[in-house]
Amino acid sequence: MLDIKKIKEILPHRYPFLLVDRVISVEEGKKVTAIKNVTANEEFFNGHFPEYPVMPGVLIVEALAQTSGIAMMQSEANKGKIGLFAGIDGCRFKRQVIPGDQLLLEAEITRMRGAIAKAKVKATVEGDLVCEAEIMFALSDLPK
């Protein structure tokens, strides 16, 4: 399990764009399960939509990408790198995410060859599928 302090040591993202609150399980270099607690105080609900707050799908995908980044950085060979979003395939949304929901984020690295990685990802709320996709990343060194 990784708390927010450990997550910030791995990911360069910060408020308001850090979308992973806690990592609840890790299979080193392979799979990560994390959570994002969606509260009524999220900045994006001010405009999406004030009378009917729904988490933007692109931010659900970003939370999944960040979870994938944590999975990739668990490999010793990738320490000090960043996974840059390079593509997405088969993305489907099945359920809305609203204030009070807890997103369960799962990312499994399916391919890591050179500087390219792929992850199969899915987000659920209370067991209901929210989103699934395959995300591709280009690994790059973090600037010093």
Curated annotation (Swiss-Prot):
Protein name: 3-hydroxyacyl-[acyl-carrier-protein] dehydratase FabZ
CDD domains in the cross-refs: FabZ
Reactions accelerated catalytically: a (3R)-hydroxyacyl-[ACP] = a (2E)-enoyl-[ACP] + H2O
Gene: fabZ
HAMAP family: FabZ (MF_00406)
Annotated GO biological process: fatty acid biosynthetic process; lipid A biosynthetic process
Location (main, coarse): cytoplasm
E.C. numbers: 4.2.1.59
Catalytic site positions: H48
Organism field: Listeria welshimeri serovar 6b (strain ATCC 35897 / DSM 20650 / CCUG 15529 / CIP 8149 / NCTC 11857 / SLCC 5334 / V8)
TM spans (from-to): none
